[in-house]
């Protein structure tokens, strides 16, 4: 089952916000516990930044191919 880009654009921040709120309510050392990769808080902060970085570098590569191709 694959989701389209607009659905993922809305779904990923909502899921990560839910995980962040869950981490804030459950974990005792919430701000300091976000550095461990075993923590749900780490991934809820990582997911929203992953998609824009991927889109940026994908477009950067495409522009590089368009502008600097040799005929």
Curated annotation (Swiss-Prot):
Coiled coil regions in record: none
Keyword Ligase set for record: no
Positions of transmembrane segments: 2-21, 45-65
Domain of life: Eukaryota
Keyword terms: Endoplasmic reticulum, GPI-anchor biosynthesis, Membrane, Transmembrane, Transmembrane helix
Membrane topology annotation: Multi-pass membrane protein
GO cellular component terms attached to this protein's record: endoplasmic reticulum membrane
Lumenal face of the membrane: 22-44
Pathway(s) per entry: Glycolipid biosynthesis; glycosylphosphatidylinositol-anchor biosynthesis
InterPro entries: PIG-Y
PANTHER family named among the record's database cross-references: PHOSPHATIDYLINOSITOL N-ACETYLGLUCOSAMINYLTRANSFERASE SUBUNIT Y (PTHR39235:SF1)
Protein name stated in the entry: Phosphatidylinositol N-acetylglucosaminyltransferase subunit Y
Organism: Xenopus tropicalis (Western clawed frog)
Lineage, opening ranks: Eukaryota, Metazoa, Chordata, Craniata, Vertebrata
Gene name of the encoded protein: pigy
């Amino acid at each position: 089952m694959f989701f389209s880009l607009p659905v993922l654009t809305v779904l990923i921040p909502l899921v990560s916000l839910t995980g962040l709120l869950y981490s804030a309510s459950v974990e005792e050392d919430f701000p300091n516990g976000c550095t461990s990769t075993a923590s749900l808080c780490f991934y809820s902060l990582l997911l929203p930044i992953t998609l824009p970085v991927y889109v940026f570098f994908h477009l950067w590569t495409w522009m590089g191919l368009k502008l600097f191709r040799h005929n």
